[in-house]
Amino acid sequence: MNLNPFWSMSTNTGRKRSDGEEQSGEQQQQQRASPARPSFGKKQLPSIPKNALPITKPASPAATAQLANGTHASYGPFYLEYSLLAEFTLVIKQKLPGIYVQPSYKSALMWFGVIFIRHGLYQDGVFKFTVYIPDNYPDGECPRVVFDIPVFHPLVDPVSGELDVRRAFTKWRRNHNHIWQVLMYARTVFYKINTMEPLNPEAAVLYDKDVQLFKSKVVDSVKLCNSHLFDQPKMDDPYAISFSSWNPAIHDDAKERMFTHKRRPEDHHKGLQVSGLSWVKPGSTQPFSKDDNPPQN
């Protein structure tokens, strides 16, 4: 039986001899020649179970740990990165109106965003925010949304600026809930006011009992947020969202291209073919207008 060196100590060094037992001269000579061993008294090592593995150092819990979703811990960082990449792809595909979001350069668990409110009580409001994603996503709690400047709103904490997201996502369910839904909820709260269990009781009371004063407070809040729109980002991150004043030398040309952009003729013909209208003459919507006989050279 091969044993780990940790277990290779002989169990006979402490064996109790009979009173009349004497060692031979040869054994005494061997003992003098060999280095002295530490005395273990009369104690013996416990017997080794048949299938036991030697323990040479404390076992690391992370070595055998598994994530809640069954993924081995060693794959955790890669699984998290893939999940966040998939979530950001979903955000792009949803084309959320009035919302722009950008992951942080330093951490994929932090996203910078801005919401543009185009009508309603918060019209013309431009609210910058940060999304904080749990490090065990998607098996943890709901991502948090914190506004850079606290907005006067029943569901926004007047001190920290955090939006009450958990009322909409009481329990985060992986593969069912997505970050784009959190972003959409952050936009919806400015169009549909909910005063139940508010984080800002003052805003809730004014909305229910004195809507005119509530509107006045909202206007002041919007002006405050917009007045800090061109401030430098609070975080030192190259991907943090920042605004700059209109610069005609830079922005006029980009604006002109946006308004005068036209599809190229080849793109137009390609679109007709892809749509299955091969029997329609390019530039026409009349059925069967395409000439079946190609021109002869």
From Swiss-Prot:
Example of a GO biological process term: lysosome organization
Disordered: annotated span: 1-45, 262-297
Topology class, membrane: Peripheral membrane protein
Location of the protein in the cell: Cytoplasm; Cell membrane
Comp. bias intervals (Polar residues): 1-13
Assigned keywords, A-Z: Apoptosis, Cell membrane, Cytoplasm, Membrane, Protein transport, Transport
Name listed for the protein in its UniProt record: AKT-interacting protein
Organism encoding this protein: Salmo salar (Atlantic salmon)
Lineage of origin: Eukaryota, Metazoa, Chordata, Craniata, Vertebrata
